[in-house]
Amino acid sequence: MASTELSLKRTLTDILEDELYHTNPGHSQFTSHYQNYHPNASITPYKLVNKNKENNTFTWNHSLQHQNESSAASIPPQQTYHFPIFNKYADPTLTTTTSFTTSEATANDRQINNVHLIPNEIKGASETPLQKTVNLKNIMKVSDPYVPTRNTFNYDVKISNDFFDNGDNLYGNDEEVLFYEDNYNPKMQWSLQDNSAAINNEDARAIFNNEFDSDDDDISDDEEDEIEENCLQQEQHQEEPLLSLDVTPISMFGSDQKTGRAKSSSHLFNEYSYVDSNMDSISSVVSEDLLDERGHEKIEDEDEDNDLDEDDIYDISLLKNRRKQSFVLNKNTIDFERFPSPSTSANVPSTATTGKRKPAKSSSNRSCVSNSNENGTLERIKKPTSAVVSSNASRRKLINYTKKHLSSHSSTNSNSKPSTASPSAHTSSSDGNNEIFTCQIMNLITNEPCGAQFSRSYDLTRHQNTIHAKRKIVFRCSECIKILGSEGYQKTFSRLDALTRHIKSKHEDLSLEQRQEVTKFAKANIGYVMG
């Protein structure tokens, strides 16, 4: 077998063993250490330093004696240091940092290699080329690689990076150019300089403060002034109160009555204009009429009447808690209310049809008009002596008129809700926005109406389906039966949630599992009672 193939079988154990006993190239040692030593054919033959010692076999007793007499003078220690220990396939000298002194090299040179070469393999060993090794001692440029390098600088070292060296990073997130201030410090862009004299004996805090001075001036004085002005303007807008209904600038009632009578019936089509925004149309109509008919009035009164134009938040729907349909009254609305024409009465439906809720918006509008006509919410208004008195009186009349219209509209809607159920089953009464549903089913025992009241129609329906059902389902409490016997059996519950409340209140000492058992017993033993 070729010597190169044999050299592949040298293991790491052999290498560590040689290093442990300070083996030197070309020598064998500790022959007598292995009592029953036999040459290992797998060990790679090496080039010996002294070829006359190739086939020598020594015992441990006279090996040391031979070391004192051997070829220390024939080969100098410097030459033995450069001989390789291993072949090219397992050369650990690439990472070795062992340095030999003269005494160590002389002592190691006296050692004897314990490898017995086969004569046929000597030629192959001599032809194995020597590998060029790399020593960490030369790479690290230090006397001792295991001694950590010490900082020999007597001043602080500034650490930075090359972030600002890249031109793409000169813009921040707010699209503003960095370093536009006059106190820009270019030392921020310096790279790591260990031997730079420019930063010698500088304090780290001083460097930091000088580098980041511009951060304190991110917001200029002009921007601060603008922010303060905006805040003051917002506070002023928030502090402005909403115009109350007492100052509503509508003076339609103070106009001449003859003007309304002379108008044609075609204006009735525009009598009620339903909108969902503000009262701009009211103010525009009123302002035009005032300019035509009352040009002699003062400018102060006109400014007072036009205050509503400046407030878009105002809405008639603010009269109630919830938003309702707001409507606009034209100038001649009141005159047509006082003197209804035949066409008006023909277009307005009777109040008997308002019992049911109409899906169309026009029908609900007509019901509002009819209610206002029958109730007679408006009175004849005398013409005031002054414009100020007439405007105040007209505003009060408009408020009363609007409130009555809205209340009649809400009462009509509330009265139409319970019409879905049979009238004999229950009745409902409206108290403002709160509706009360009353059960009117006759009690067979007392021969009187039940009279149970509920705030929701759902509760009333559930009451009638359970209490007044012909065949009622009842639940019994097993704990009451155990304690009271027949009296506890007579105690029944129409709903399961009532039984649950009974268990929590009357049987507080029961655990959760025991309560579940009582509920299961009630479900399994449902009773029926004929009503």
UniProtKB/Swiss-Prot annotation:
Bias (Low complexity) ranges: 362-375, 408-430
Q: Which Gene3D superfamilies match?
A: Classic Zinc Finger (3.30.160.60)
Write out the ranges of the annotated region (Disordered).
338-432
- PTM per Swiss-Prot/TrEMBL: Ubiquitinated by UBR2 in the presence of UBC2; which leads to proteasomal degradation.
Instruction: Please tell me whether the keyword Transcription regulation is annotated for this protein.
Output: yes
InterPro entries linked: Zinc_finger_trans_reg, Znf_C2H2_type
The identity of this protein, by name, is Protein RPN4
Which source organism does the UniProt entry give? Saccharomyces cerevisiae (strain ATCC 204508 / S288c)
The gene it comes from is RPN4
